Every structure is written in structure tokens, then in C-alpha cells.
């Protein structure tokens, strides 16, 4: 019997590096200026925040943000931050997260508040791309 990836049910793995081609397609549409959830080695934009900078504490006003946050327990805080920052003038936030429509954050900040929700067909191949993610994904545009 095939075992399921434990990351599907826990916060064991929180950092899922965005597939470059997937990001490039979104960037061609939105022209991102800020990546608030980056490491020095995987930043998708010239302007970025690392864990040391704590993107949750930074101001995103006036930016076009690509946010692929850690998928652990703090995801609620990241979704709230994305929604809150998007309300600032000249700020657009595009959020890549697991498609978990049963969560509190989905109903409080995404459903009926997002400009657009795009469910990704199939499973993204994060990181080195050798295996698909153990969860479906969605792109949320605020």
C-alpha cells in the first residue's frame, strides 16, 4: 500500500519553492515587484523579504506582491496579511497556497473577498520538481 506524504497532514514541511515556469507565467501577467516570503537563494523578485526580515511585519503598500508563504500553522497570519495589505491603494497581492476551502482563513479572508480564485488543475511540482505536491493548490488574487 502506498503511504501518503506526512506533510499533507502536518506542518513538517512548510517551505514549498515555487516552480519557476509557474511563477514566470504569473509574473508576465502581474509584473511583480515584491516577494515577501523568500530566502536569499529563491527570491522571485528584486525586492524581497527573508525570514529574518519577517514579511508579516513589513509594509507592502504600492507593491505588486507574489506571496508563496510557509504552509504551516502561520498560514492564517499570511492570508490575513495578504488581504489586509491588498486594501492599501495601488497594492495587488497574488497568493499561492494549498486549496483548502474548509479552513477558517479561506472563509474569513478569501471567499467573497478575493478578486479572483484560480484552482490549479493537477498538482504543482514544487522545489526540484521531482514529485508532485501532496495537495492541490490555488492562486488567490486580492
Give each language-model segment a name.
Residues 1-142:
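Class I S-adenosyl-L-methionine-dependent methyltransferase catalytic core
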Amino acid at each position: 500500500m502506498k503511504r501518503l506524504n506526512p506533510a499533507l497532514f502536518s506542518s513538517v514541511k512548510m517551505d514549498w519553492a515555487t516552480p519557476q515556469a509557474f511563477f514566470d507565467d504569473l509574473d508576465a501577467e502581474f509584473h511583480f515587484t515584491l516577494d515577501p516570503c523568500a530566502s536569499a537563494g529563491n527570491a522571485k523578485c528584486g525586492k524581497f523579504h527573508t525570514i529574518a526580515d519577517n514579511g508579516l511585519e513589513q509594509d507592502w503598500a504600492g507593491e505588486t506582491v507574489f506571496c508563496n508563504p510557509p504552509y504551516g500553522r502561520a498560514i492564517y497570519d499570511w492570508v490575513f496579511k495578504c488581504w489586509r495589505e491588498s486594501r492599501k491603494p495601488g497594492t495587488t497581492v497574488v497568493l499561492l497556497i494549498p486549496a483548502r476551502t474548509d479552513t477558517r482563513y479561506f472563509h474569513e479572508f478569501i471567499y467573497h473577498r478575493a478578486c479572483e480564485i484560480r484552482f490549479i488543475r493537477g498538482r504543482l511540482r514544487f522545489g526540484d520538481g521531482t514529485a508532485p505536491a501532496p495537495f492541490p493548490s490555488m492562486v488567490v488574487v486580492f
